Amino acid sequence: MVVDKEIHTHIHIHISIYTHEEVYTMDALAIRENTAIQPSIAITEEILARFIAYIDASPKTVATYSRAIRQFIKWLSVNGTSQPTREDIIAYRDELKESHKPTTVQSYIIAVRLFFQWLEQERVYPNIAQHIKGAKISKEHKKDYLTSRQCKNVMSGIETDTPQGRRDYAIFALMVTGGLRDIEVHRANIEDLRTLGDSTVLYLQGKGREERAEYVKVPEETEGAIRASLADRKDAKKSSPLFISMSNNSKGNRISTRSISGIVKSALVKAGYNSDTLTAHSLRHTAVTLSLLGGNSLQEVQQFARHSNISTTQIYAHNLDRMANQCENTIASAIF
């Protein structure tokens, strides 16, 4: 690499991740612009905090990006790289692909790209990560859906003669009729269940949202299940969680997303549907799929599922069209 001495300066960047009690130093070539760059800068937890504040992300994204940057810096240290280049980031990405899911690789590389973009803006290091791609993520859904018959089988297997059983049945019914995500069930409060016109609705705080602006209609059968569950909680207030934990360790607290996933998974397994591709999120896929099969338009289902882009809804329609395609059977009939 040829360096013009008039417009470049050679600096040392000390990257310290004190959590791991290790310090990594990398020499960097940084472009001098209108004002001079500091001869050295320590990239510590304080610098990482500034970076996170810059991206202004949700707590979950903050945790992911922090973890991603720490792992990248550790990778540089292990590989003895003191002056990372674009090729190093590509090598790091390819190594991630060997042991991580495409979605994880994608989020980690996005974090690295943003980090170097910010470093260049701060005149600490040139943006060597610009335009580097992460991992190709399939648009096909990784979770299966249940047929209407399978839904009935699962729900009939949930015993409703105990408070826990009534709660579990209500959760399952709400998720499959409303297409709710586990985080939406977790965040729901009793006061979010309201009357709107002639319908009972549940206002939701969706994924990445800070307020309850959207809602789903709650069918009579689902509302009955929810009311039966709430009847077991005589001291519940309007501001109380819609569903609470009944385990000894967290009894009375807001139910966790992990518990919701476990409740759904247990019900599926009990009904004989034990598959890695059938999870709590499958109930959302089920809701969208049954809506389309029932004749609802793409626009109606998009609104119901709270898809920001109709292309997401179209993926479901495409999958259904593919399942209805009889080309393979036509060929088999012709040659056998």
Residue spans for each PLM region:
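Conserved catalytic core of the tyrosine transesterase superfamily
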Residues: 2-4, 8, 14-336
